[in-house]
């Protein structure tokens, strides 16, 4: 079946790296504890993984690299070590065939031990994806301490340069009561907004220093438990059409946002649930797909 006749396939994966390679207490320990996984990467990729100071970051980098190779090799039917990503003109990782086609578009995000992968196989022309994951509890103690010392308005001001003016006003208007419960709820709104914006920006492929970032607004943003309707995105005050931006809970402590831009002719793809992926499945596939 030719690509033109193929229907798009949405891929939504998540890997929890916390239980992986438990004997690796330092990054250098991965050379033995994760030798099987590392052997499925090029020397350049291995060096990129092992340069991280914290082993938790190295494990996430390793899982992310394997996720991308697995998806490309499996869904594009290419040998494992030919499943290489390059960077486009905006430095976004892509997989491009010699013909110039992109049979798989994808985006990866990782935070607090979790790697999240969103991709579309055989995407219609113009379709784009972005994904971001946040873990509000990861910085909870530090955030609560900051709120106790400096207050909510000051906390928002510290991060105001990465949000739109309307978003800053919306955050400040929350003015949470000075209780742990009230501050926790406000922080969930803060991280929900952060996650939504990141996914959208990653979808566009533009850098975080894009000139339009201050003109971007997630209108009436909310964490998953308070989100009543589809997320509306505005740019310079006007609603952005043809983009589906969502926020959903993941496991117990995470939120994940997906941003999908319709194809040039309005084609849409349907999201499902994120599926937990077993590292053994990736390694077994990689070993088989890397054999001559």
UniProtKB/Swiss-Prot annotation:
Top-tier EC class:
transferase
* InterPro entries reported for this sequence: 4-PPantetheinyl_Trfase_dom, 4-PPantetheinyl_Trfase_dom_sf, AASDHPPT_N, P-Pant_transferase_sf
**Name of the protein in question:** 4'-phosphopantetheinyl transferase 1
What's its job?
A: Transfers the 4'-phosphopantetheine moiety from coenzyme A to a Ser of an acyl-carrier-protein. The enzyme is able to transfer the cofactor to a broad range of enzymes with acyl- or peptidyl-carrier protein domains. Required for primary biological processes such as growth and asexual/sexual development, and activates target enzymes involved in the synthesis of metabolites such as fatty acids, nonribosomal peptides and polyketides such as the gamma-pyrones fusapyrone (FPY) and deoxyfusapyrone (dFPY).
- Which Pfam family is an annotated match for this chain, by its short name? ACPS
What does a knockout show? Leads to lysine auxotrophy. Impairs the production of the gamma-pyrones fusapyrone (FPY) and deoxyfusapyrone (dFPY).
Matching entries from Gene3D superfamilies are given as: 4'-phosphopantetheinyl transferase domain (3.90.470.20)
Under catalytic activity, the entry for this protein gives: apo-[ACP] + CoA = holo-[ACP] + adenosine 3',5'-bisphosphate + H(+)
User: Origin organism of this chain?
Assistant: Fusarium mangiferae
GO MF entries = holo-[acyl-carrier-protein] synthase activity; magnesium ion binding
Q: In the UniProt record, which is one GO cellular component term? A: cytosol
Family, according to the entry, reads as follows: Belongs to the P-Pant transferase superfamily.
């Amino acid at each position: 079946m030719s690509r033109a006749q193929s229907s798009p396939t949405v891929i939504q994966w998540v890997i929890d790296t916390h239980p992986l390679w438990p004997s690796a207490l330092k990054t250098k320990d991965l050379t033995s504890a994760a030798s099987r996984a590392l052997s499925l990467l090029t020397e350049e990729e291995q060096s990129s993984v092992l340069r991280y100071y914290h082993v938790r970051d190295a494990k996430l980098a390793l899982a992310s690299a394997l996720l991308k190779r697995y998806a490309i090799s499996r869904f594009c039917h290419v040998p494992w070590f030919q499943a290489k990503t390059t960077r486009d003109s905006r430095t976004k990782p892509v997989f491009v065939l010699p013909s110039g086609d992109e049979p798989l578009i994808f985006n990866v995000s990782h935070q607090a031990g979790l790697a999240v992968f969103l991709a579309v196989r055989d995407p219609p022309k113009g379709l784009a994806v972005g994904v971001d994951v946040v873990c509000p509890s990861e910085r909870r103690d530090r955030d609560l301490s900051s709120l106790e010392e400096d207050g909510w308005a000051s906390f928002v001001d510290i991060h105001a340069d990465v949000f739109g003016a309307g978003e800053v006003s919306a955050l400040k208007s929350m003015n949470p009561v000075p209780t742990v419960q009230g501050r926790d709820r406000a922080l969930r709104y803060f991280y929900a907004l952060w996650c939504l914006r990141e996914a959208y920006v990653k979808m566009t492929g533009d850098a975080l220093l894009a000139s339009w970032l201050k003109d971007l607004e997630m209108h009436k943003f909310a964490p998953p438990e308070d989100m009543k309707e589809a997320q509306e995105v505005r740019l310079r005050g006007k609603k952005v059409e043809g983009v589906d931006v969502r926020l959903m809970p993941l496991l117990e402590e995470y939120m994940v946002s997906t941003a999908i831009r319709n194809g040039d002719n309005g084609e849409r793809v349907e999201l499902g649930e994120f599926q937990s992926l077993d590292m053994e499945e990736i390694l077994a596939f990689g070993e088989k797909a890397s054999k001559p």
